[in-house]
Amino acid sequence: MSLGLGLSLYSNAQIDKNATRETKALYHNLKKLSKKHVLFGHQHATEYGHGWSGEADRSDVKSVTGSYPAVIGIDFMGFSGRSPEDIAKSVATLRQNVIDTYQRGGVTTVAWHFSNPASGGGFYWKDSISVAAMPLIKPYGSHHEAYKEILRTIGDFAKSTKGQDGKLVPMIFRPFHEFDGGWFWWGKPHCSREDFMDVWHFTVSYLRDTLGVHNFIYAFSPDNKFTTEEMFLERYPGDDWVDMVGMDNYGDFGRDGKYNLTAGIQKLKIVSDYAQKAHKLAAFTETGLESIPNTTWWTETLLKALKTEKMRLAYVLVWRNDTRSPTHYYAPYPGQVSEPDFLKFYQDPYTLFENDLRKIYKKKFLGLF
């Protein structure tokens, strides 16, 4: 294969034409793997877990299966709205987390529970002093310069996170998630479609073109409030501004004891079908069942949904295991009632964990172990 042909494969539909070779390889290899597999992810998997925090070489998933999740979720929540000292600590801790995942061969995805930069409040609308900040942080808004400063912190982090090979670590960046709901200050009831898209366009262009961040894959992920492709794309910034399309969906997968797998599968298919049509990646960006009381949830609910309709999803990520709460967890730990079923989920050839991956950041992808 000629060098030119090889590079064209890796830049297919990626919105950053100057993305690093490792980022292009990750994009291409995720697309390739999604034809026959799905990577399993867990939010905050290595930072803390059920009853523990800050222990090296540990995750609840690893304690159960022997492998880390293939995808580790982190959060830029600590990069703003705090003292400079606390921000610096958060940056340093997350940097090491991302590097460690890269060194092991895993993948990092980044959520952003973004404290309201106009009110000084939290990321939930009710905690953000009900300030509609999206029109204020867009270009020419009253808090635009403050937003640029926050993005510079993210840009500096991205450009400082390097593996032992000296290469920048690729990350899937998923800003302004679940925007179709009203619980976050960037949610649909609190900003116009135009304001949302303007902020998205500025965020990508400022990071990519002004700050020179070239190790991000940009993911668009509403919650589950759509039933058609048109509704899914209602606030879509455009194919030139998105690398991955996804969905967060807890409601159709057992939340509060309510299941609507038919609806959940239909929505996942809308995501997968659009990705294939637009030559994008697709993912099930968040899901899970709190406390996992359903002993066969992993195989009879999640895996069954993922395998239906021959969808192409790069990964599925379940939410965090809180360190203090006895009930707020979404992945099993040793002795948890769904552990035997999770092991069946882990052993299924369709699901991939970190131990299954091989050279996912290399252009000459060698597949799986």
Task: State where each predicted segment sits.
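N-terminal module-boundary/linker segments of secreted carbohydrate-active enzymes
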Residues: 13-73, 77, 86-89, 349-369
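Aromatic- and acid-rich polysaccharide-binding/catalytic face
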Residues: 72-74, 232-261, 319-321
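Alpha-helical scaffolding within the catalytic cores
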Residues: 24-26, 52-61, 92-96, 154-157, ...
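Bacterial Sec-dependent N-terminal signal peptides
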Residues: 1-14
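Aromatic-lined carbohydrate-recognition surfaces of secreted/lumenal glycan-active proteins
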Residues: 41-43, 174-176, 200-230, 280-293, ...
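Substrate-binding cleft of secreted/luminal carbohydrate-active enzymes
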Residues: 34, 38-45, 280-369
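Hydrophobic faces of well-ordered beta-strands that scaffold small-molecule active sites
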Residues: 38-42, 70-74, 108-110, 171-175, ...
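Substrate-binding cleft of extracellular glycoside hydrolase catalytic domains
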Residues: 77, 81-204, 209, 213
